[in-house]
């Protein structure tokens, strides 16, 4: 990939469990949680891709998901991600995300992701956005819309909160 056309350089994601204590103003809070660390080295170039859909959720020790659909342009896309059950990781080899949006704004409100795993198993993830933050990035005459959704997910009998992040170029 041409470095000038990359979206996020040296990007990685890690599902993890975090334990510890957090002290604020003399109060101590115990932390025992699951989540996902998302990191890129250097700046992101939001205008280098046409769109993406990124869904992530930790349901606890039994289930974690990360779903990614990236469209570098209007003609092509990459798809992937993982489903982790009881510590066993399985790759997503094909996916389809059906999303609903506000009528008058490009804000996503819900989605259904049909996932095909490398084993051939099909898994469905349903999401409903319960909190939304619209963002935008402007560079060299381009406007990019990024929507961050706190999302209630349902998958394989589990329900939990996670993130749905959608990026689209504004024409």
Feature roles, as predicted:
Residues 1-171:
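Structured soluble/peripheral alpha/beta segments that form catalytic or ligand/cofactor-binding pockets
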């Amino acid at each position: 990939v041409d470095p000038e056309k990359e979206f996020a350089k040296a990007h990685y994601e890690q599902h993890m469990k975090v334990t510890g204590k957090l002290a604020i103003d003399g109060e101590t809070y115990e932390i025992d949680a699951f989540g996902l660390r998302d990191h890129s080295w250097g700046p992101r170039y939001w205008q280098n891709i046409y769109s993406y859909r990124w869904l992530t959720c930790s349901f606890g020790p039994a289930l974690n998901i990360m779903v990614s659909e990236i469209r570098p342009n209007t003609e092509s896309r990459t798809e992937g991600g993982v489903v982790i059950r009881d510590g066993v990781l399985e790759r997503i080899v094909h996916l389809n995300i059906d999303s609903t949006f506000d009528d008058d704004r490009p804000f996503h409100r819900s989605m259904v992701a049909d996932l095909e795993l490398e084993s051939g198993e099909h898994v469905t993830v349903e999401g409903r956005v319960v909190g939304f933050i619209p963002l935008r990035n402007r560079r060299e005459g381009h406007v990019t819309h990024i929507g961050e959704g706190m999302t209630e997910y349902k998958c394989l009998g589990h329900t939990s909160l996670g993130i749905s992040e959608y990026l689209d170029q504004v024409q």
